[in-house]
Amino acid sequence: MNRTKLVLGAVILGSTLLAGCSSNAKIDQLSSDVQTLNAKVDQLSNDVNAMRSDVQAAKDDAARANQRLDNQATKYRK
């Protein structure tokens, strides 16, 4: 039991020391990278949303053009 506690304590101490070895500069750099990536994701999301409205407008125009063609085709058949 004492040996288990000793090993467990050593593992906890070792992990604490390893966590303390990371520098603040590296953490700040990673945080900055994450913020940059989040900004890019937001921009891409906005671009996709803008394209959705453009695609919908193109679909609507195509549907109107097809309807006009269908109307012309029925006039020629009569």
From Swiss-Prot:
Keywords: Cell outer membrane, Cell wall, Coiled coil, Lipoprotein, Membrane, Palmitate, Peptidoglycan-anchor, Repeat, Secreted, Signal, Virulence
Positions where lipid (S-diacylglycerol cysteine) attaches: C21
GO MF annotation, one: peptidoglycan binding
Subcellular location: Cell outer membrane; Secreted, Cell wall
Residue positions of covalent lipid attachment, annotated as N-palmitoyl cysteine: C21
Deletion phenotype: The integrity of the cell envelope in a lpp null mutant (double-knockout) is not affected.
Region (Disordered): 56-78
Key word Metal-binding present: no
Protein task: Plays an important role in virulence. A highly abundant outer membrane lipoprotein that controls the distance between the inner and outer membranes. The only protein known to be covalently linked to the peptidoglycan network (PGN). Also non-covalently binds the PGN. The link between the cell outer membrane and PGN contributes to maintenance of the structural and functional integrity of the cell envelope, and maintains the correct distance between the PGN and the outer membrane.
Name by which UniProt lists this protein: Major outer membrane lipoprotein Lpp 1
Organism the protein comes from: Salmonella typhimurium (strain LT2 / SGSC1412 / ATCC 700720)
